[in-house]
């Protein structure tokens, strides 16, 4: 008996990309004041499309408050995705505040301090 042919390995990435694009538009229409200026960084979808982790950062506003508000609006957003996506299972959304940009800014500040300290040491020598 022949093995079951799996769907294209890129399909998961395509679905995740489409979810990200559609969610960007749907989130823009939310009226919750706790949601700041949100940027979606990426979406990870499970192989069975049952769950999707949506990673986001916040330019303006509180990240934790935005995460709470987005997770509360997840059902509404999932319903909006259901109307836009043409797949059998629309994943349950789980929003995760991505602190990568904050950590990168902190690292840049540390590097700048180290370089400034080193140049002072070189000038003193």
Curated annotation (Swiss-Prot):
One of its GO terms (molecular function) is ribosomal small subunit binding. It is found in: Cytoplasm. Keywords: Cytoplasm, Ribosome biogenesis. The keyword Aminoacyl-tRNA synthetase does not apply. GO terms for cellular component: cytosol. Its main location: cytoplasm. GO terms for biological process: maturation of SSU-rRNA. SUPFAM superfamilies: Ribosome-binding factor A, RbfA (SSF89919). It comes from the Bacteria. Pfam families: RBFA. Gene3D superfamilies: 3.30.300.20. InterPro entries: KH_dom-like_a/b, RbfA, RbfA_dom_sf. One of several proteins that assist in the late maturation steps of the functional core of the 30S ribosomal subunit. Associates with free 30S ribosomal subunits (but not with 30S subunits that are part of 70S ribosomes or polysomes). Required for efficient processing of 16S rRNA. May interact with the 5'-terminal helix region of 16S rRNA. Monomer. Binds 30S ribosomal subunits, but not 50S ribosomal subunits or 70S ribosomes. Belongs to the RbfA family. HAMAP family: RbfA (MF_00003). This is Ribosome-binding factor A. It comes from Acidovorax sp. (strain JS42). The lineage of its organism: Bacteria, Pseudomonadati, Pseudomonadota, Betaproteobacteria, Burkholderiales.
């Amino acid at each position: 008996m022949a093995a079951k042919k799996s769907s294209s390995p890129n399909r998961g990435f395509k679905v995740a990309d489409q979810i990200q694009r559609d969610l960007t538009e749907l989130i823009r229409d939310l009226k919750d004041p706790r949601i700041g200026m949100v940027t979606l960084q990426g979406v990870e979808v499970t192989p069975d499309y049952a769950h999707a982790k949506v990673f986001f950062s916040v330019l303006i506003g509180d990240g934790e408050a935005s995460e709470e508000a987005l997770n509360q609006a997840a059902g509404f957003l999932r319903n909006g995705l259901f109307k836009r996506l043409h797949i059998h299972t629309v994943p349950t959304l789980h929003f995760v505040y991505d602190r990568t940009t904050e950590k990168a800014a902190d690292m840049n500040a540390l590097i700048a301090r180290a370089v400034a300290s080193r140049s002072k040491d070189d000038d003193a020598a």
